[in-house]
Amino acid sequence: MAAAVRQDLAQLMNSSGSHKDLAGKYRQILEKAIQLSGAEQLEALKAFVEAMVNENVSLVISRQLLTDFCTHLPNLPDSTAKEIYHFTLEKIQPRVISFEEQVASVRQHLASIYEKEEDWRNAAQVLVGIPLETGQKQYNVDYKLETYLKIARLYLEDDDPVQAEAYINRASLLQNESTNEQLQIHYKVCYARVLDYRRKFIEAAQRYNELSYKTIVHESERLEALKHALHCTILASAGQQRSRMLATLFKDERCQQLAAYGILEKMYLDRIIRGNQLQEFAAMLMPHQKATTADGSSILDRAVIEHNLLSASKLYNNITFEELGALLEIPAAKAEKIASQMITEGRMNGFIDQIDGIVHFETREALPTWDKQIQSLCFQVNNLLEKISQTAPEWTAQAMEAQMAQ
C-alpha cells in the first residue's frame, strides 16, 4: 500500500490543475496514508513528506498540507510519530525558511514526546531549534515567552541550571510585554526555581514568598510556594537580608502549618541549633539543596553554622576559637575561617585577635536603631492619616472634633 501512495504522489506532482483541486487530492492521499498501520504507514508518510518538500509542488499547497500533516501525527503511536518528526525535520532542513511555521509545530510535538519519556535534555534541545528571534516568521510575545519558559523548565528537570538561567533571562525580556496572567505566574515560578537551583537562596525565597500571596494560584500551590520560601530562607547565608526574611515568615501564620516551622522559630529567636535537630528537615530538601560546598560540608550545615555563629555573637562579647568551635560543633580553625569571612562580608560585626585566638563581637547601639524604627512608624501613621482625610474629609473632621472635645 505504501508503494501505491508513492505512485499516486508521483502522478499528482506531474499533473496540473487549480491549487484547490490539487490540495484536495493531496489531502485524500494523506488520509489514505494515515489509515495504514505499522511499517506501511511509516513508509507512506515518509513518501508524503518527500513530496511536500519537493520544489515541483507549489509552496502554497505544501505549506497547507504540511500543516494538516502535523495535526494528524499526535494521534499516531509515539514511536512512529517520533521517527516521522525526525525524518520531516531532516527533509525540510534545506528549505527550512519556507516552512518555519510547520517546523515550529513539528518541534513542539516532538518535544512533547521526549517530555513524556522524561528525556528532558532532548526535549529542550528540540525546542531550542525553533528560530524565535532570528527567523522570517514573527512569533507573538506569548508564544515566545511560553517556549522560553518551557525550555528553562526542561533544563531544570535535567539538572542544568546554567542553561535554564540563560533561557529564563530571555523570558524576562518579554514578560513585561505579556498580558497573560497565567504566563506571568509560570515565569515567576520558573525564575524562583532557577534562583533556587543556582543557590541564590534569599532571592529565591523572596520570589517564592511573593507567589504565595497570588490569589490566581490555587491555595495548595500557594502553601507549597511558602514551604519553598521557608526552606530557601533556612539555607541562605546568615545576614540582614535573611533576618528580614525570617521575620516576614515568622509573622506569617500560614507557616505554622509547615513541617519546618520549628527550625524557623529557633532561627528567628536566635537560638543555637544542634546537628541532631536537623535530620528531619534535611530529609525534606530537594536533591540540589543537599549538595556539598567547597569545604565538604552540606549547604544546610554551612547555613546552620553561620546562624549559630550569629546567635553566639548576641550571647557573648568575645570567645576563643576553641570554645567557639565546641559551641558550633566544628574544628576551631573552621570556626575562625567562617567568622572571618562573615565579618569581612559585613554579615557580622566584630574583629579577630589572632594572637590571643579570640573573636570579639560588636553590638550596634540600640538607641539609634529604635529612633529610626519609631521615626519610620510615625511617618507611616502620618501617611495613613493623610490618605484617610483625602478619602473621607467629613469623617476626619468629626473624629478630630470628638478627639478635641475629650
UniProtKB/Swiss-Prot annotation:
<dbReference type="InterPro" id="IPR000717">
    <property type="entry name" value="PCI_dom"/>
</dbReference>
<keyword id="KW-0007">Acetylation</keyword>
<keyword id="KW-0736">Signalosome</keyword>
<dbReference type="Pfam" id="PF01399">
    <property type="entry name" value="PCI"/>
</dbReference>
<dbReference type="GO" id="GO:0008180">
    <property type="term" value="C:COP9 signalosome"/>
</dbReference>
<keyword id="KW-0963">Cytoplasm</keyword>
<dbReference type="Pfam" id="PF22241">
    <property type="entry name" value="PSMD12-CSN4_N"/>
</dbReference>
<feature type="domain" description="PCI">
    <location>
        <begin position="197"/>
        <end position="366"/>
    </location>
</feature>
<dbReference type="GO" id="GO:0008021">
    <property type="term" value="C:synaptic vesicle"/>
</dbReference>
<keyword id="KW-0968">Cytoplasmic vesicle</keyword>
<comment type="subunit">
    <text>Component of the CSN complex, composed of COPS1/GPS1, COPS2, COPS3, COPS4, COPS5, COPS6, COPS7 (COPS7A or COPS7B), COPS8 and COPS9. In the complex, it probably interacts directly with COPS1, COPS2, COPS3, COPS5, COPS6, COPS7 (COPS7A or COPS7B) and COPS8. Interacts with TOR1A; the interaction is direct and associates TOR1A and SNAPIN with the CSN complex. Interacts with STON2; controls STON2 neddylation levels. Interacts with ERCC6.</text>
</comment>
<dbReference type="InterPro" id="IPR040134">
    <property type="entry name" value="PSMD12/CSN4"/>
</dbReference>
<dbReference type="InterPro" id="IPR054559">
    <property type="entry name" value="PSMD12-CSN4-like_N"/>
</dbReference>
<keyword id="KW-0539">Nucleus</keyword>
<dbReference type="GO" id="GO:0005829">
    <property type="term" value="C:cytosol"/>
</dbReference>
<dbReference type="InterPro" id="IPR036390">
    <property type="entry name" value="WH_DNA-bd_sf"/>
</dbReference>
<keyword id="KW-0770">Synapse</keyword>
<feature type="modified residue" description="N6-acetyllysine">
    <location>
        <position position="25"/>
    </location>
</feature>
<dbReference type="InterPro" id="IPR041406">
    <property type="entry name" value="CSN4_HTH"/>
</dbReference>
<comment type="similarity">
    <text>Belongs to the CSN4 family.</text>
</comment>
<comment type="function">
    <text>Component of the COP9 signalosome complex (CSN), a complex involved in various cellular and developmental processes. The CSN complex is an essential regulator of the ubiquitin (Ubl) conjugation pathway by mediating the deneddylation of the cullin subunits of SCF-type E3 ligase complexes, leading to decrease the Ubl ligase activity of SCF-type complexes such as SCF, CSA or DDB2. Also involved in the deneddylation of non-cullin subunits such as STON2.</text>
</comment>
<dbReference type="Pfam" id="PF18420">
    <property type="entry name" value="CSN4_RPN5_eIF3a"/>
</dbReference>
<protein>
    <recommendedName>
        <fullName>COP9 signalosome complex subunit 4</fullName>
    </recommendedName>
</protein>
<dbReference type="InterPro" id="IPR036388">
    <property type="entry name" value="WH-like_DNA-bd_sf"/>
</dbReference>
<dbReference type="GO" id="GO:0000338">
    <property type="term" value="P:protein deneddylation"/>
</dbReference>
<feature type="modified residue" description="N-acetylalanine">
    <location>
        <position position="2"/>
    </location>
</feature>
